């Protein structure tokens, strides 16, 4: 096999090497520095890089810095392949903390150590399922996987860094090595397919934590034996980087990224008591992590790597379902292989236990890709053949179940110190200056992101990699992006200016949950009933108190308060029995985690009543350091909870002290801040909000609008009656607008009327009169006027109180003014004498016509 590095693209990172602090020189023997290969060599290669100049050796390229993008052509089994690589910026997202010790024991801390990022990730052109993980720190080392059935390792050649050795993965046999999950296993995380699907759909309605990217902040600790095996400190750093790179590659398909935030090397002596018993070593390491490492270097998981051989076939041990726990999130691993692939696979296995992954079931229920009879799944209980490269579907389902049950809240947080130092488009992480990053062109599926520029496409507001973005548009501020999963979880809402959901915030330790059956611890609500259901399925409940107490006070495989560092079972004190092994009844016949090793039944008598008790011995694997014990925070009595597997007062968790600053109107979250009740203002919940809520305001406005509409409708329905009532209230002023069918009562026809002619057109009256009643049909004939002249005026009633223009009374006989035009001849009398008006001295009585009167004539026309 022959490899040639043809050209490098995007030399954004090329330049002078970054300055680094002086590293310790440990020294060592030649035997310690040289290790014989454990596989059959398949060939060698000479690495050369061609840029814009003639070909250069890799060593010459490293003198000026590493390119951020590489394109490599190589031959594998006489076939030409092209690798497309980018620096893995997620591996070292910031400047990690490097710790070592001087001969006098002084701790040397280099925060923000300028560790050269010499590791790359990528894929092989033309192979969609391929992946590549290479480091070029000093020579080329790494892994090339074309398919689940075909993969190659690249190792350093003996004595020549420029001639890496290629071998097939199938040649890396790790005979007799097994894993040992720790005895401290907490909550079962694997379920049968039927139950898992039922729970899956129920939980997906609440929260989708599976598609969100999780980040494990990792610290690797090298003990003194590991330091002496690699006395060149830079070589130790390179090996650590290579292991972390493979870890990140293994977990990436699960949407979990591994970020190396620190490396501690015990350069002078070990800081804990070492032991070949992995359980004892794990207990010592976790105690040191909790009291020494964690306070000065925040992280999510710590892994100890040692050359010390473990007793038996085990190569590692960890705590089941312990991620984010300050007490149990860690593991111990034996550096059992010269190949970094074997060590990285072992660390990935133990880290998987911390994430809630159980061993893969034997047989075909959890098939692993790879050629028979080799096994290539990371969570296989035994690595009798080759190191695992992938996680099975069972592991995927177990991780999803653990996340949906509230595990791993710390994985959704990203510390500001982890911000990348520069931008690199295509690394699937949004670096400074980028708006999005969907990876390589052939793997980018985001319609909102331009994979060539890592900028949003025109019209897009966000990239679809976050829950706060839909169809390239941002959800508004306040949109629920992460609903709570249990009583200890708090909802998160979109900020309105980002596609990412804020960090997962949960209730603080000691806050009550599950109706008082437990308190929140490390963001989880662990009631005894829920723990039984997680182990034995729906319907499972805590065992009877007598059965529980009897089993856990005996101190054997069926009941105890855990194992001592020496491996023996410890009986529980009567006060602590609720904090020991889980004792359940009912549910399924087979557990969802592990397998039943043995069963024991016994009839107990209490107060004259016989009680049938049944206990089981669960086999969780050799790498599980403790039996299934009750989770911290489980209620064990009034005001008492399990802390450190002992029943202690809940006040020790400090919830009351934290709650005081919320002044009785809120609770504390995991960040130590008050979450105020509705109607109270943060940050201390002292001020009561007086403003009416928007919902109340909207309801009031709606009711007011409805009332207005009802009034308008009633007014329209009764409009006729209302009009009549208004006329009555106004009196006579309304009569001129009243309909003709209802005229106001008027006096009878007057005895005198205005003399008018009988033409076709209406004549002009001598003075304005208001319209009231019809005019007389015919004027009075002149020959009758003399007979009526001496008749007295008839009595009249007063007119309505309307303004009427009247003429002043004349002193002479009343006579209508002559018209402008000559009047026609008087018609023959057609009216009876009684209907004619008589003469008089006064004013003529007003006669109201039936039609509107014409406008009054000008004053000059009234008299001729």
UniProtKB/Swiss-Prot annotation:
Residues 1-17 form the signal peptide. Residues 208-696 are extracellular. Residues 741-750, 768-780, 814-825 have a biased composition (Pro residues). A motif (Cysteine switch) lies at residues 177-184. The keyword Transmembrane helix applies. Its main location: membrane. Residues 214-415 form the Peptidase M12B domain. Mice targeted for deletion of the first 27 amino acids of the ADAM15 N-terminal sequence are viable and fertile, showing no major developmental defects and displaying normal mortality or morbidity. These mutant mice, however, exhibit significantly reduced ischemia-induced retinal neovascularization, choroidal neovascularization at rupture sites in Bruch's membrane, and VEGF-induced subretinal neovascularization, and develop significantly smaller tumors following implantation of B16F0 melanoma cells. Aging mutant mice exhibit accelerated development of osteoarthritic lesions in knee joints. This is Disintegrin and metalloproteinase domain-containing protein 15. It comes from Mus musculus.
